[in-house]
Amino acid sequence: MNPIRMKKLESEIIRQISTAILEGKVKDPRVFLPSFHRIEISEDLKYAKVYFTALCNNNERKKLTQGLVSCAGFLSSFVGKNLRLHTNPKFTFVWDNSYIKSLEVNRLIDDSAPKTLFEELHPNPEEDDGDTDAETLLEDSESGIERET
């Protein structure tokens, strides 16, 4: 299949699965707002591996995965009907560890990045060493209090 058509089909399948969950067509209470990041479809369109994450702990993650696995048949027929596919893909849902790891790498990069000149010249007020900030000076000037600078 044409790679461009395959990419369009992948994004449309993810959109259809998300729509089914958001519109309440999936009745399983274990399925609660997962984020679908990518999908790998076989060339013959019979199999699709759907990668997802969600903001949850390990116990909730297991329940969410079980819920998605249990409604995979429904989602397959829902997607097949809406996209008018010749064969409905069999979905396999996989927790996306690579997405979580990429978020951690981004956080580490942000933490190790050098401070900007502005941050060096104007430290955070929480880290203030007793210096007065502009708001305090403004409040004092309005109330008539004079400070030594």
From Swiss-Prot:
One of its GO terms (cellular component) is cytosol. GO terms for molecular function: ribosomal small subunit binding. The keyword Glycoprotein does not apply. InterPro entries: KH_dom-like_a/b, RbfA, RbfA_dom_sf. Residues 116-125 have a biased composition (Basic and acidic residues). Residues 116-149 are annotated as: Disordered. Disulfide bonds: none annotated. One of several proteins that assist in the late maturation steps of the functional core of the 30S ribosomal subunit. Associates with free 30S ribosomal subunits (but not with 30S subunits that are part of 70S ribosomes or polysomes). Required for efficient processing of 16S rRNA. May interact with the 5'-terminal helix region of 16S rRNA. Monomer. Binds 30S ribosomal subunits, but not 50S ribosomal subunits or 70S ribosomes. This is Ribosome-binding factor A. It comes from Leptospira biflexa serovar Patoc (strain Patoc 1 / ATCC 23582 / Paris).
